[in-house]
Amino acid sequence: MLSFAGGFCLYIGEKSEVSMNVPNKLTISRFVLTFAFLAVIFAKPMYYETIALALFSVAGLTDYFDGKIARRDGLITNFGILMDPLADKIMVCSAFIAFLGCGWTPAWMVVIVVARELAITGLRLLAASKNLVLAAERFGKHKTISQIVAIISMLVLYSYQQWGVAGRIFGLNILWGPWVGWFAPLSLWVAVILTFTSGVIYLWRNRRLYLADL
């Protein structure tokens, strides 16, 4: 266990010399936005669902733009390869746990999502201890998109009724009302199914990495 942790710390130390380019700054900002999201959800100020919706939407946008900018400008770094998916996992798991605390999501769904993300994170840490970097796969990226869509849809579901007069003036209630009641639960199911399936596939494809230590 000590060698495992030591290998990971050594890996991070070696990569700490990488300059904080724009994609990496966006990745780090996702950690900050996630903390702010959790603070709002659990403090429950007035219109907290809408505030949480705005914070999570911005966090989701950083996930899109950090990868896009990194690929476009050739700014892909080992730091980004490791920390970008980690930021995604913390963001998503935090949201699902917060939803569980609010009574919005069944416990078994949260268990599947959190267990999957912890398992994949553990696999990446194991790879890091061996000086290997496991990049996210396409199926995993689709999974992350489905999770973000599901979380935003659930936040819309629980916030749009608060919009009252403003919602009627700007037509938001008309825009969201007809579909959010069925789309949010459906997107949640899709996200959980993709989360479980992508996790099984990722663990199977990289089985040699952890089976070698058994």
Located regions from the model:
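Small-residue-rich segments of transmembrane alpha-helices in multi-pass membrane proteins
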Residues: F35-F37, M83-F96, K143-S153
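Active-site His/Glu-centered metal-binding helix of metallohydrolases
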Residues: V32, L61-I69, L86, I90, ...
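Helix-adjacent hinge/juxtasegments
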Residues: I81-V133
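Helix-loop junctions at the membrane-solvent interface of multi-pass transporters
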Residues: V40-K44, L100-G101, L126, V156-L157, ...
